[in-house]
C-alpha cells in the first residue's frame, strides 16, 4: 500500500526534508494587519518575525477550510492509496476538526491531532514518513502509533 504523509505548514520542516520524504504540506493562513496570507507562499516565518520585531502587530492563523482540505486530500490521493495527515493542536485551531470532516467526505485519509506545533509536529511527521516508507504498517496503524507517540512530546 502506498501511504502518503502530509502535514499542515505549522510543522516547520525544511524544504529538504519535505522533498526527501515526499511530505505533502497544507498551508494555513496567516493574518497580518487584517490581510490573509498563505503560509509559506505569501509570507515566510522570517517575514512574520521581522514584522513583529519592527513593532508590527502580532500575526494570527486562520484554519484551513473543509473545502481546501477536500481539494488537498484528493490531490494527495492521486499518487497514494491513503493519506495520514498531521495537524496543529485541535486546542489551538479548527484545522483538525475541518480535516476530519473532509476526511469523511474523501475517504482513505487518517487525520492525526498532533496536540502540538512546529518541532513537535515535525518529529511525528518524520517518524510517520519513515514508517510509511518501510511499508509494514497500514495507514490506520501509522495513525494509531503516532497518536500514542504524541503523548511523549508533552
Predicted regions and their residues:
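Internal, active-site/partner-interface "lid" segment
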Residues: 130-154
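A short, well-structured juxtamembrane/interface segment
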Residues: 64-75
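Short, small-residue alpha-helix embedded
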Residues: 121-133
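Long, charge-dense
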Residues: 112-124, 142
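Short Gly/Thr/Asp-enriched flexible loops that form oxyanion-binding sites at enzyme active sites
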Residues: 88-106, 123-125
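Short beta-strand segments
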Residues: 7, 85-89, 113
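Glycine-rich phosphate-binding loop signature in dinucleotide/nucleotide-binding domains
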Residues: 76-82
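N-terminal glycine-rich anion-binding loop in soluble enzyme alpha/beta folds
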Residues: 4-65
Amino acid at each position: 500500500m502506498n501511504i502518503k504523509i502530509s502535514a499542515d505548514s505549522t510543522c516547520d520542516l525544511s524544504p529538504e526534508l519535505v522533498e526527501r520524504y515526499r511530505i505533502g504540506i497544507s498551508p494555513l493562513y496567516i493574518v497580518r494587519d487584517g490581510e490573509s496570507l498563505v503560509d509559506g507562499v505569501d509570507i515566510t516565518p522570517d517575514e512574520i518575525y521581522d514584522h513583529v520585531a519592527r513593532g508590527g502587530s502580532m500575526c494570527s492563523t486562520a484554519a484551513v477550510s473543509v473545502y481546501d482540505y477536500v481539494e488537498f486530500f484528493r490531490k494527495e490521493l492521486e499518487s497514494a492509496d491513503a493519506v495520514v495527515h498531521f495537524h496543529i493542536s485541535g486546542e489551538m485551531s479548527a484545522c483538525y476538526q475541518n480535516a476530519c470532516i473532509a476526511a469523511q467526505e474523501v475517504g482513505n485519509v487518517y487525520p492525526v491531532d498532533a496536540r502540538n506545533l512546529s518541532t513537535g509536529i515535525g518529529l511525528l511527521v518524520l517518524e510517520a514518513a519513515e514508517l510509511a516508507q518501510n511499508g509494514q504498517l497500514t495507514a490506520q496503524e501509522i495513525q494509531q502509533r503516532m497518536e500514542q507517540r504524541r503523548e511523549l512530546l508533552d
